[in-house]
Regions:
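Functional cleft and adjacent loop/helix regions within the main domain
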Residues: 35-40, 46, 91, 151
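Active-site-adjacent beta-strand/loop module that shapes the phosphate/pyrophosphate-binding cleft
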Residues: 77-115, 127, 149
Length: 154
């Protein structure tokens, strides 16, 4: 069975092309940089929620802010993994400041097999990043999204 996610990739030309990405939170990602970043995104159930609505909801939940106003462009559907599909929207985020975030949280057993539950931020920081750095930082399944964004803006 395939799981579906939707995400919103903000971009700006500052003067070079940059994207807003977020470092995943929690103990697994704490000491990682390469492959440990993501666009704001999350799961949705096709037929029960529209991908764009899910992308907006996840942006709000993960970053604690509303996405800026503007024209959303669907970049496409990407195979994030063999069992997960990701619908991505692009939005010009010129003027959107990467500050004032209120990161959403999740709970998990920590330390493992301890029987104790701890809360961690879904993401622990977000920032504007040039495309070369973003290609290294993004999780592997999201890297093709950057190529699609470049094609859109060419």
């Amino acid at each position: 069975m395939v799981a579906w996610s939707a995400g919103l990739l903000l971009y700006r030309r500052h003067p070079a092309l940059e994207v807003l990405i977020a470092h995943m939170g929690g103990p697994f990602w704490a000491r990682k940089e390469s492959g440990a970043w993501s666009m704001p995104k999350g799961e949705f159930e096709p037929g029960a929620e529209e991908p764009r609505d899910a992308a907006r909801r996840e942006f709000r939940e993960e970053l604690g802010l509303e996405p800026p106003a503007g024209e959303w462009v669907e970049l496409g559907t990407f195979a994030a993994t063999s069992s997960k599909r990701l619908v991505v929207f692009a939005l010009d985020g010129t003027g959107f400041e990467a500050s004032g975030f209120v990161f959403g949280e999740f709970e998990m057993e920590w330390p493992p097999r301890s029987g104790r539950t701890a809360s961690f931020p879904e993401v622990d920081r977000a920032k504007w990043t040039g495309l070369d750095a973003a290609r290294d930082r993004l999780v592997k399944g999201q890297r093709p999204v950057l190529d699609a964004l470049e094609r859109l803006l060419a």
